[in-house]
Amino acid sequence: MNARLTVLGSGTSMGVPTIGCDCAVCHSSDPHDRRTRPSVLIQYEGRAVLIDTTPDFREQAIRENIRQLDAVLYTHTHADHILGIDDLRPISFLHKPNKLPLYARPDAAEFIRNMFRYIFEAKYKFGSLPQVELRPLDGPLELFGARFEPVPVIHGETEIYGFRFGSAAYLTDHSDIPESSYAKLQGLDILFLDALRHKPHPTHSTVENSLRIVERAKPKRAFFTHICHDLPHEETNRTLPPNVRLSYDGMKLDFEI
């Protein structure tokens, strides 16, 4: 099936521009240097699957004219990946009397349920709450004829999910990739990887480390995401191999799912 991936956000947890920062990237006139928190939308066969609800989801949805979602997948529970959950309200209302399904690994699902009790506990059923249903995910999932396979990655000291779907994979927030996960990254047309900056970080990959991952996984094309203000878009792209680029907010890629 033909599918389209839209990069809703390509930035790090603080976004770019970063509050109070006077660096050149934060004051850049290049729109590619404006980076909201990391998320992608996958569309195929009239369906739409979102990966992560960032604090910028409302802005991202308005920018991309998102009017429909059929499922949401969560990579993990850090603030920059879940805090936009309440902004699912207007889209989730379109699912009534059904609820919009949200999928997360079991430990993440429990965390989300506890953090947003007003959404999930019956005693809080008042007002216009998001009409969503949280479902634990511990293996491959078929959504509307497409297979979404969790790809475990290491984020600091925590195991979280990336996802493979068809000929594409999206891995964000990783400091290491387990040996067993490389088997899930073979034969890719598109691979998204975390590349925060050049300087080492305890929970995120660097540009140099992600280039080594590209050399091993051998996708046709690779795109870096979760980018901080240390990496100017155009200048950094000039240093990368021809099949590797920084992603940017609003980027659209077609692939087979």
Model-flagged regions — what are they?
Residues 1-171, 180, 237-256:
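Binuclear metal-dependent hydrolase catalytic cores
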Residues 176-257:
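Cap/insert and terminal regions of metallo-dependent hydrolase folds
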